[in-house]
């Protein structure tokens, strides 16, 4: 099957280079180009491409608005190009939430210096997302609304009595919050078979993680460690976004973090995250990987392998949507220790690569839709009445 691609960018140079790279592959054909979002919307309607590559910052109509328009009228897998800045990361996350399938950093120097790698990466991504069905009403739109968090106090108490009053107020607010959470999530009888939830994902992962984490209650009984293939500039912005949306606390993992129940730790981009110590006092170790032997930074395999030594079989591991097979070897090590491994089902994946790898290897025991994953996790860890 030949993948028909529409290339959208306000830079004529970048459009030419992307076209050259894609047409190096006989399975890809560029059928058109556009220099702004408005043209992209119109050409998606007339040309009916299999995949669209899209810049974010463009005149007339930006990439995010174009994604929204295309996904509501002529849905098509869209690969975004993004700058490696905090602002670029935020815009990219907005595009993914609007319905884009995946993104790549927009790095002109890589195209010039590492052409072979740039060619393979772009071609592989386009072919991978072209194989997945899309719908007019994207699953991204059904993410639960943001959960209001307790506002931070703007001033410090001035006397000991003020401090006591403030602390009592905080405790009362926390008790009320916990009561609301327990009521909405059902009664909790902690499943002692587990002490940690571990999630690994790649392409399509930002939306999948947001979908799951926004449904977990603030009194979630275990720490959560997450590995998402993502550049270094993106993981901070992504963790901050999730923290603002979720009842559980979400943070970008830092070296030395002690794992705490109800907190989700996102592996920082460009580095490797391992867990050391013992359950109850385990710490995160964030390390640079200069060996050149590991393709992914961060790597699901490395994180899961470290968990097999620290938490052994007391882990519920979940492999979500993503290209390749990262997570298969680490999941096997966890399963050998008695851990439980689940995979996202094919129908709800953006790319059925990583989940397929653990399923075909006989490592995962269940395949679950993205829509049902959070509820399945909560039932498994001990919430009743769901």
From Swiss-Prot:
Record flagged with keyword Hydrolase: yes
Q: What is its EC number?
A: 3.1.1.61, 3.5.1.44
The record's listing under CDD domains reads: CheB_Rec, REC_CheB-like
List, from the UniProt record, the residues annotated as the active site of this protein. Answer: 202, 229, 326
State any GO CC term: cytoplasm
- 4-aspartylphosphate occurs at 55
Q: What biological process terms from GO does the record include?
A: chemotaxis
Q: Region Disordered: which residues?
A: 133-161
Matches recorded under InterPro entries: CheB-like, CheB_C, CheY-like_superfamily, Sig_transdc_resp-reg_Me-estase, Sig_transdc_resp-reg_receiver
User: Which SMART domains does this one have?
Assistant: REC
Cite the GO molecular-function annotations of the record: phosphorelay response regulator activity; protein-glutamate methylesterase activity; protein-glutamine glutaminase activity
Enzyme class (EC, first level): hydrolase
Top-rank taxon: Bacteria
What is the purpose of this protein? Involved in chemotaxis. Part of a chemotaxis signal transduction system that modulates chemotaxis in response to various stimuli. Catalyzes the demethylation of specific methylglutamate residues introduced into the chemoreceptors (methyl-accepting chemotaxis proteins or MCP) by CheR. Also mediates the irreversible deamidation of specific glutamine residues to glutamic acid.
Protein family membership? Belongs to the CheB family.
PANTHER family xrefs: PROTEIN-GLUTAMATE METHYLESTERASE/PROTEIN-GLUTAMINE GLUTAMINASE (PTHR42872), PROTEIN-GLUTAMATE METHYLESTERASE_PROTEIN-GLUTAMINE GLUTAMINASE 1 (PTHR42872:SF3)
Stated name of the protein = Protein-glutamate methylesterase/protein-glutamine glutaminase
Species for this entry: Idiomarina loihiensis (strain ATCC BAA-735 / DSM 15497 / L2-TR)
Gene symbol of the encoding locus: cheB
């Amino acid at each position: 099957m030949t993948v028909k691609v529409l290339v959208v960018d306000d830079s004529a140079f970048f459009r030419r280079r992307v076209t050259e790279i894609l047409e190096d592959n006989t399975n890809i054909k560029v059928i058109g180009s556009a220099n702004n979002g408005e043209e992209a919307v119109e050409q998606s309607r007339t040309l009916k491409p299999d995949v669209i590559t899209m810049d974010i910052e463009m005149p007339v109509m930006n990439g995010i608005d174009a994604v929204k328009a295309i996904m509501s009228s002529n849905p098509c897998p869209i690969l975004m190009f993004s700058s490696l800045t905090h602002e670029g990361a935020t815009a990219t996350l907005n595009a993914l939430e609007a319905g884009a399938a995946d993104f790549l950093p927009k790095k002109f120097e890589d195209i010039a210096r590492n052409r072979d790698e740039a060619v393979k990466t772009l071609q592989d991504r386009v072919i991978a997302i072209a194989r997945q069905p899309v719908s007019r009403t994207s699953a991204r739109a059904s993410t639960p609304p943001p959960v209001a968090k307790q506002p931070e106090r703007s001033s410090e108490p001035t006397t000991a009595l003020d401090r006591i009053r403030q602390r009592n107020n905080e405790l009362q607010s926390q008790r009320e919050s916990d009561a609301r959470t327990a009521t909405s999530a059902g009664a909790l009888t902690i499943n002692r078979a587990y002490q940690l939830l571990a999630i690994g994902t790649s392409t399509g992962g930002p939306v999948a993680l947001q979908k799951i984490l926004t449904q977990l209650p603030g009194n979630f009984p275990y720490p959560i460690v997450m590995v998402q293939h993502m550049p270094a500039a993106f993981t901070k912005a992504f963790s901050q976004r999730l923290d603002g949306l979720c009842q559980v606390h979400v943070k970008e993992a830092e070296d030395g973090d002690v794992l705490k129940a109800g907190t989700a730790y996102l592996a920082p981009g460009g580095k490797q995250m391992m867990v050391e110590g013992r359950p109850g006092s385990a710490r995160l170790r964030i390390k640079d990987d200069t060996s050149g032997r590991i393709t992914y930074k961060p790597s699901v395999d490395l994180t899961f392998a470290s968990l097999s030594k620290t938490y052994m079989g007391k882990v519920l591991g979940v492999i979500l949507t993503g290209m390749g097979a990262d997570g298969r070897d680490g999941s096997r090590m966890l399963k050998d220790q008695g851990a439980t491994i689940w995979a996202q089902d094919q129908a709800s994946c953006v790319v059925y690569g990583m989940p397929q790898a653990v399923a075909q290897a006989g490592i995962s025991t269940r395949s679950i839709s993205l829509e049902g994953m959070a509820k399945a996790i909560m039932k498994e860890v001990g919430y009743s009445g769901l």
